[in-house]
Amino acid sequence: MKIFPAIDLKNGKCVRLTKGDFKSVKIYNENPIHQAEIFSDAGFKYLHIIDLDGALEGNLTNLDVVGKIIKKFNFKVEVGGGIRSEDSIAKLLDLGSDKIILGTAAIKNESFLENCCKKYSGNIALSLDARKNNIAISAWKNQTKIKIFDYLNIVKDYGISRLIYTDIERDGTNTGPNFENSYKIADNFNIPLLISGGISSINDVNKIIIDDKKIEGIIVGKAIYENKIKLEIAALHLVAAWNVFTHQSHEKHVLETRRRMSKVTDFITVSKEKSKSK
């Protein structure tokens, strides 16, 4: 299973919201590049980046920061937030993004989603962000009457490469994800699915693995930033997954993870010392 640590960008900083409420914004790192470095050194292979300013304004706003992260680190990065045109998609793919996340533009215009899936085959992810099964758009500020499963039945054959389902009422709350809806999506639609919103502990991760519902992975935000899920534990879950898929030595992967975690500890120590000296 893939674990995507999340970096949400606002005013060039790494932040988290609660239930998508911009009044609840909390800064976790002034420097998103440093945050990406922490995730990279911990051994994560995937990264979820959302441009919150872009989502609000309807265009790419933090493109420079996104580009620097992609260029500096060896993540497979999925990027979303304010992507409403093919020009924006092309720019992000040129930077090296692995997946482009469409939300508002896709919900408003199904033909746009279909055309993008054809033109950028394998690169388009669809974000389904909902309150009580009704999809929300425009940085989650506008609630539609469109039901998740009704919409999926329309677009299921477009060639979407990934679905991202977020229960907005759980996002940033550390109360656990909406397993019921997540599993229903996984069971009824043959599209790789990432679960987002409310992942609270390693127990949530274990449940998804044990339940074996064809989930591609999870997106984790506040639970990692607030040490509900410790980096080293999440990384060890990745080790187990790599072992299953590559049939390589588990001991070898554990040693590699410990080496990387040592680098993370050193990095955090140096960062704290630098902060004290300022």
Residue ranges and their predicted role:
Residues 61-116:
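Glycine/small-residue-rich loop that forms an oxyanion/phosphate-binding "nest" at active or ligand-binding sites
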Residues 3-9, 47-49, 77-81, 100-102, ...:
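Hydrophobic faces of well-ordered beta-strands that scaffold small-molecule active sites
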Residues 60-67, 110, 141-150, 175-184:
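Charged helix-capping and loop-helix junction motifs
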Residues 12-23, 97-171:
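Conserved anion-binding
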Residues 112-119, 206-211, 220, 224-238, ...:
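C-terminal helical cap(s) of enzyme catalytic domains, especially alpha/beta-barrels
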Residues 77-96, 180-182, 186-214:
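Catalytic cores of alpha/beta
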Residues 83, 94-112, 169, 197-201, ...:
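Glycine-rich phosphate-binding active-site loops on the catalytic face of alpha/beta enzymes
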Residues 46-64, 104, 165-175:
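Glycine-rich, proline-tolerant flexible connector loops at the mouths of alpha/beta enzymes
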